[in-house]
UniProtKB/Swiss-Prot annotation:
PANTHER family linked: DNA INTERNALIZATION/COMPETENCE PROTEIN COMEC/REC2, RECOMBINATION PROTEIN 2
Source organism: Escherichia coli (strain K12)
Subcellular compartments: Cell membrane
Gene Ontology process terms (BP): establishment of competence for transformation
Record protein name field: Uncharacterized protein YcaI
Membrane topology summary: Multi-pass membrane protein
Transmembrane segments annotated in the record for this chain: 3-23, 24-44, 50-70, 223-243, 254-274, 320-340, 370-390, 392-412, 446-466, 471-491
Amino acid sequence: MKITTVGVCIISGIFPLLILPQLPGTLTLAFLTLFACVLAFIPVKTVRYIALTLLFFVWGILSAKQILWAGETLTGATQDAIVEITATDGMTTHYGQITHLQGRRIFPASGLVMYGEYLPQAVCAGQQWSMKLKVRAVHGQLNDGGFDSQRYAIAQHQPLTGRFLQASVIEPNCSLRAQYLASLQTTLQPYPWNAVILGLGMGERLSVPKEIKNIMRDTGTAHLMAISGLHIAFAALLAAGLIRSGQIFLPGRWIHWQIPLIGGICCAAFYAWLTGMQPPALRTMVALATWGMLKLSGRQWSGWDVWICCLAAILLMDPVAILSQSLWLSAAAVAALIFWYQWFPCPEWQLPPVLRAVVSLIHLQLGITLLLMPVQIVIFHGISLTSFIANLLAIPLVTFITVPLILAAMVVHLSGPLILEQGLWFLADRSLALLFWGLKSLPEGWINIAECWQWLSFSPWFLLVVWRLNAWRTLPAMCVAGGLLMCWPLWQKPRPDEWQLYMLDVGQGLAMVIARNGKAILYDTGLAWPEGDSGQQLIIPWLHWHNLEPEGVILSHEHLDHRGGLDSILHIWPMLWIRSPLNWEHHQPCVRGEAWQWQGLRFSAHWPLQGSNDKGNNHSCVVKVDDGTNSILLTGDIEAPAEQKMLSRYWQQVQATLLQVPHHGSNTSSSLPLIQRVNGKVALASASRYNAWRLPSNKVKHRYQLQGYQWIDTPHQGQTTVNFSAQGWRISSLREQILPRWYHQWFGVPVDNG
C-alpha cells in the first residue's frame, strides 16, 4: 500500500470531524472498529482502504472525546490540581495545563485559560502551581460570519476556562525558554520595534500594539507574525547550509548528504521549542520531519505527494487540528502554489539575475493572491487590496534580512560579543522601521466581502484551467455555464414579501436586526469593553457579510450593554437616523404614540410615556414591528413596574407573534400579565452563558413555557433568525439548525448559566 494512499485514508477518515453534528457513542465506535477489522481481512484493495479510513475515523473521534472529557467532567465542582504555566501576560491572564488532578497524574494534560486575577507571586512559564480551581467548559458566541471562538479553543486544546480559589507555587523556577525570553526582553527595551522583534523571533504576540496588528491585517501581512513555515524552514535551511559548509573541512569518508538535512531539521526543532512550540510551529515541525523522511527515502516525490503526506501526518498526530483555520489557510496556500507552478510556471525570460528574481517574486505573489482568495473570504470575510504590493516588500525584507538578523542576534545573545549583538539588534530594528514605513504609506486596503461574492472568488482557478486547457474554444458552452453559476448568487434578489429578524449572539447585551430588501434597522447595538465593542467586532462585519445596508438605529435605553457599539457603527455609516427615549442631540423621539413606516413595515412605540423623567431599565423604548399579519415586540430592559403601567391602557396593542424577553430574562421583568397580554408564540432572550446574574432565570423561562411560548436564548441557540413571508414565519438557530456541529454544543453542566 502506497504511503500517499495511507495519507488519503487519514485525511478522509479525520475530515468528518469538521462537519459532524455530534460525536458517535462508545458502542458505535466499538462496532466501527470491529467492522473495520473484519473488512481488513477481505483481499480487495478498495475494501481495505475503506477499513483503514474507518480506523482513522475512530482515532479522530477518540481524540475529540479526549479533549472534551475535561469540559464534561471537571466543571461544576471545585478541583484540586497541579497546573503547569505555559504562557502568561505577567498580570491576570495565564495559560496552563492541568497535569495532576486530585493527586493523580492525567495524560494528556488538559489546557486551561485563567482570567481576571493576579497570582500570589511573580509568575512565568514553566512554573508548577498547586491550585484549587473552579473551571468552566469553553463556550463562545456564535454568529454567521463571526469569529468561532469555541471551535478555536478546541483546536488549540484549551477546553477549559476558569479561576483559582487558592494557589501556591510548587516549582518556582521558570523554564529555560522563559528565562531566555526575559533576558531578551531586557536587552530589547531600548529598541523602538522590540515588540515586533519578539513576535518574529519568539512568537510573543501579546505585547504587539493593536495599531501594528491593524496595519498588518489591513495590508495582508499578518501571516509574517506567526512562527510557522517561513521562520522554521528558514532556520532549517540556514542550519543545513552551515553544516554543509562545514563539511568542506572534513575527510571525504565523513561527508554524507543526509547530515545537513538531519542537522537542519534538528536545529529547526530546537528553534520551534524556543518559540514556545505554538500550534502553527508544531504543525510545521511535523510537516518538516515528514518531508525529511520522504527525502531520506531516496525516492522522487511529487509536490502533491509531499502535500498529502505532510497534511496526513499533522492530522494523525493531532486530529482536532482539522478545526484550525490556520491549518486550512496554510494547507490551501501550499496547494495553491503547487497548482500555480504546475499550470502557470514562471516565464523563463532572458533577464539579468536581479530582474529575474523580481519577476519570480511577482509571479509567486500574484499566484498566492489570486488563488488564495476563496479561503481568505471564507475565513476572514474580506480581502486586502494592498496585500499584493505590501507582500512584495514585506516577504523578501522579512525573509532575507529581518529574520536572519533576529536569528543571528538570538544566537549571539547566548555567546557574545555584546557589540556584535547590539549591532544585529539595531539592524533588525531599522529593517522593521523601513518595513512599517512602507506599510503605513499604503492606503487602507481592507474591504469586507459579502457572502454573495464567495463563489465568484473561485474565478481565478476557473479561468486558469479554462485558459490552459483551451476550453474557451473547445467547450465554450461549459465555460459560459461555469461563469454563470459563479455569478448566480449576485443575481438573486430578496423576495419582496419576505423580511427577517435576527437576534445576534453578543453575550450579555442585546443587538437585533430587522432586514428587508437589503436594508436594515438595528434595535440596540450590543455592549462595549475597554478594548472594543460589539459594533466593531461583530455587527459591522456581520452586516457586510450579509450585504445589508443599515438605515437607522433604535436605542432602547442608555445602558452600555445596549448602546455599546453605536459609535463604531456611526463611524462607518454616519448618516443613520437614531430613535431613542434619551432626548440626546440628533436623536428622534421613541415614546408612546410615535409611529412610522419603513419598507412596508409599521413601527409603533408603546413606552415610555411622553415627558417621562425615568431613567435606566424602566425608561426602555418598547417598539412593535408589524407587517399586518405577524409582529414582534421589542422590549429592551423594561421591568415589572413599567410593564404594569404600559399595560394599564391600550393593552390590546401589545399583542405580538414574537416577544423579545425583557432584561435578558431577569426575575425583575416578564411579569405574568405582560406574557399573557402579548399572547405570543415565541420568546427570544439574549444573554451570555456565564453571566454574574445567572440570566435568564429558570423561573422566567418556565413562566413563558407554561403560557405556551417556545423559548429560545442565545447561549443555547446562538444567532437566531426569524423569516417572515406570506406563508407564515419560520425560526432557525445557528447552533441547532443552520450550523450544527459537535464543537458548537453546550459542554459541561447542562443547567449552568452562571
